[in-house]
Regions:
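Conserved, mostly hydrophobic/aromatic
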Residues: 9-10, 54, 109, 134, ...
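Alpha/beta enzyme core
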Residues: 1-9, 52-60, 99-112
Length: 183
């Protein structure tokens, strides 16, 4: 995937979301030899338990869910202590207003345009309003994840980064799929 700017890695614990994916050692093994920077998304109940491990990889950013159980300030500070960018993700039904007090502390807000935990879902069009709302914060990067494909990419207009899992991974030509999103 030479045309991908980074690799987005979803980590699910089976508690915050019903799906549980691979353990850290499995992820580390899968990513062995991968030179692209990683964008790690912790869809877990206790993100503080995961930061040290994922910071040890080629990680440029760790994002965690605002709805998780750990203290948001402490989690942001822990991520930054490793010299890594901190991102805060919000579910489709979480208003931007709920995370406003953290926006000066994080580097990125990840707008979930589907409910986390399952791939292949349809883009929830109402989440486009959150992108527009977040664009008022000049130093903030906006990332959108969920239901992104060549037909929905325009609904993520205003975002700095998009995550497209199913569309790219289920394509017969990864490079062509990625390029269709960039153009």
């Amino acid at each position: 995937m030479t045309s991908a700017d980074y690799i987005h890695v979803d980590i699910m614990d089976g508690e915050f979301v019903s799906t549980k994916n691979y353990d850290f050692d499995d992820i580390k093994l899968m990513l062995d030899g991968v030179s692209k920077l990683l964008d790690v998304h912790l869809m877990v109940k206790h993100p503080l338990d995961y930061i040290k491990d994922y910071a040890s990889l080629n990680t440029k950013q760790i994002t965690f869910q605002a709805e998780a159980d750990d203290d948001i300030y402490e989690t942001i500070n822990e991520i930054h202590s490793y010299g890594i960018k901190a991102g805060l993700a919000i579910n489709p039904d979480t208003p931007v207003k709920q995370i406003e007090k953290y926006l000066d502390l994080v580097d990125t807000v990840l707008v979930m345009s589907v409910y986390p935990g399952k791939g292949g879902q349809k883009f929830i069009s109402e989440t486009s309003k959150k992108i527009e709302e977040l664009n008022h914060y000049s130093d903030l990067l906006i990332e959108v994840d969920g239901g992104i494909n060549k037909d929905t990419i325009d609904m993520a207009s205003g975002a700095d980064m998009v995550v497209s899992g199913s569309y790219v991974c289920e394509s017969t030509d990864y490079e062509k799929a990625i390029e269709s999103l960039k153009n």
